[in-house]
Design a protein with these regions (language model features):
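Structural core segment of the AMP-binding/adenylate-forming
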Residues: 15-17, 58-59, 86-160, 482-484
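Conserved pre-ATP/AMP-binding loop-to-beta segment of ANL
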Residues: 24-27, 139, 162-184, 191, ...
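Conserved AMP-binding/adenylate-forming core of the ANL superfamily
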Residues: 28-74, 78-82, 99-104, 157-160
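Conserved AMP-binding A3 loop
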Residues: 39-43, 180-204
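AMP-binding/adenylate-forming catalytic core of the ANL superfamily
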Residues: 98, 104, 115-117, 390, ...
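Conserved AMP-binding/adenylation subdomain of ANL enzymes
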Residues: 203-220, 228-268, 283-284, 334
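Gly/Ser/Thr-rich phosphate-binding loop
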Residues: 267-272, 281-351, 365, 372-377
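Conserved beta-loop-beta connector loops within the AMP-binding
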Residues: 360-387, 421-422, 484-488, 523
Length: 538
């Protein structure tokens, strides 16, 4: 027997229609390339998304076609999210920080038919266009009078392209599991892998995020996380779904312009990766500024450090919510919300709790297994491979020959983790980054977080390097606040009270910059490759 409820055909365009009907005048704010602040609202975004969809359909693009965006966080990119996917095509968000070879591979692998290009990235596409046989048209995200001279095929400005579109376009009904968006993984040594999201999975993910992050309807959200990065953590969907004010910084992600935008738009909730917040906090510190309106910040992408948590809390009275997920998870899997129990703790214990990745949102299941696949207890001590499953988690990679999950539907995240008796998950390390020294394990993440607590350390990276006696030993790479080396012994003395003696790095190397990937994550494999023989040659 089945239930007697009405059939529902999911289409993410229903979200922007909902926003138009219930929150038509809610603002969508963008800082444009010129620095100008552009203001629109959900009603206008919806109407322009319809116009885009109708023109794409008129041009012969159909359900299942893959259309790419190479764009910044602005209102036009938000329109692309709905206009492309709403008419049944697939929105493929390209990362403009990709190495050219990776960009060529991804575009050709996806078989993108159109690329919507921001003006600053036109030269990048001109350099690659002869290697992209699949692309039929380039639509430049600008007004007609701003269209640059270009050799790109069939180039046209976005505003001219949608000018004759039908603002009364009716969104089509789609198949139950119709594809919606495409994003490729980053930070791997091989070719990136595509993750194909569905309309249904994105809508379910948005519902879960609203509850899992306890977002209130009067929030003004600063969306620093890029729209190209795992669907901006779902904000383009649950923002309009809940009628939230969206504030997008465009290209200017440095501390001063971010602070200016936060103050100007009374931002209450901000989303971003740790490296962005390091820049904002540094600007505030150097200029005696306080984040007056911000109540909460959601941090993900890489592990939250105690130094960032402490400064947000003690200096700015901002609550930090750590979130965890990955491209294969749409991306949100866990969140670490402030609970009444945590509020009663002393500061040291509360910080220790907040540094955990958190508990799974409804719909996500977690477990930790040993090397043989046996489930380990949730005791906060048993480390193992973190496995996940749920309705917005990958089944198989795009165009892959086989599933990426085991026979019971569990996906191996590649993380080494523990889960405690209350369900809080803590990532100890990536399986490929954990350091095995003398038969014991050293967490590179824990060592990095300890190092950035030093007042003169801006950023730290730890990698395990082959050692003739101990199998592997850590090297600590440091970027200082001044950019100049400091006394290594001061670092070791500081760490000695934070970690076990045998965890202390055998070598500390000062660098001007650490290698980051296209989404801001540390590229440890670059340092591992460069210094692989360091201990063997000594």
């Amino acid at each position: 027997m089945i239930g007697d409820m009405q059939k529902w055909t999911p289409n993410v365009a229903s979200i922007i229609e909902h926003a138009k009907n219930l929150y038509p005048k809610q603002e969508v704010i963008s800082r444009m390339i010129s620095g100008e602040i552009h203001r629109t609202n959900y009603e206008e975004v919806c109407i322009r998304s319809r116009k885009l969809a109708s023109v794409l359909e008129k041009d012969g693009y159909k359900k299942g076609d893959i259309l790419a965006t190479l764009a910044l966080n602005t209102y036009r990119h938000l329109e692309l999210y709905y206009g492309i996917s709403g008419m049944g095509a697939i929105t493929h968000t390209l990362n403009f920080r990709l190495h050219p070879e990776q960009a060529v591979y991804i575009i050709n692998h996806a078989e993108d038919k159109i690329i919507f290009v921001e003006v600053p990235f036109v030269p990048m596409m001109e350099a690659l266009k002869d290697q992209l046989s699949c692309v039929e048209k380039y639509i430049i995200l600008c007004d007609k009078n701003e269209l640059p001279e270009t050799s790109l095929k069939n180039a046209i400005s976005y505003e001219e392209y949608i000018e004759e579109g039908d603002e009364n376009y009716v969104w089509p009904e789609l198949e139950d599991d119709a594809a919606c968006g495409l994003c490729y993984t980053s930070g791997t040594t091989g070719n990136p892998k595509g993750v194909l999201y569905a309309h249904k999975s994105n809508i379910l993910h948005a519902y879960a995020a609203l509850t899992g992050l306890t977002i209130s309807p009067d929030e003004s959200i600063l969306m620093v996380v890029p729209l190209f990065h795992v669907q901006a953590w779902g904000i383009p969907y649950y923002g309009p779904m809940f009628g939230l004010k969206l504030v997008m910084p465009g290209m200017q992600m440095e501390g001063e312009p971010l602070y200016d935008l936060i103050e100007r738009e009374d931002v209450t909730l901000a989303f971003g990766v740790p490296t962005v917040w390091m820049g904002l906090l540094s600007y505030c510190r150097d200029n005696n500024k306080i984040l007056k309106s911000v109540k909460n910040t959601v941090i993900g992408g890489s592990a939250l450090s105690l130094a960032i948590l402490q400064e947000f809390d003690e200096v700015h009275d901002v609550n930090v919510i750590q979130g965890w997920g990955m491209t294969e998870m749409s991306p949100l899997g866990t969140s670490n919300l402030m609970t009444p129990e945590m509020q009663k703790m002393n500061k040291e214990d509360r910080y220790a709790m907040q540094l955990k990745q958190g508990r799974p949102m409804f719909g996500v299941e977690l477990k930790v297994v040993d090397d043989s696949g046996n489930e380990l207890p949730n005791d906060g001590e048993s480390q193992g491979h973190l496995m996940v499953r749920g309705p917005w988690i990958l089944q198989r990679y795009f165009k892959a020959d086989k599933d990426a999950v085991d026979q019971d539907g569990w996906f191996d995240t590649g993380d080494i983790s523990v889960i405690d008796e209350d369900g809080y998950m803590t990532i100890k390390d990536r399986a490929k980054d954990v350091i095995k020294s003398g038969g014991e394990w050293i967490s590179s993440i824990d060592l990095e977080n300890a190092a950035v607590g030093h007042p003169e350390v801006a950023e730290a990276c730890v990698v395990g390097i082959p050692h003739p006696k101990w199998d592997e030993r850590p090297i600590l790479f440091i970027v200082t606040n001044s950019g100049e080396p400091i006394e290594k012994q001061s670092i070791l003395d500081f760490l000695a009270s934070k970690v076990a003696k045998w965890w202390l790095p055998d070598e500390i190397i000062f660098l001007k910059d650490l290698p980051h990937g296209a989404t801001g994550k540390l590229q440890k494999f670059e340092l591992r490759d460069e210094y692989n023989n360091y201990y063997m040659e000594k």
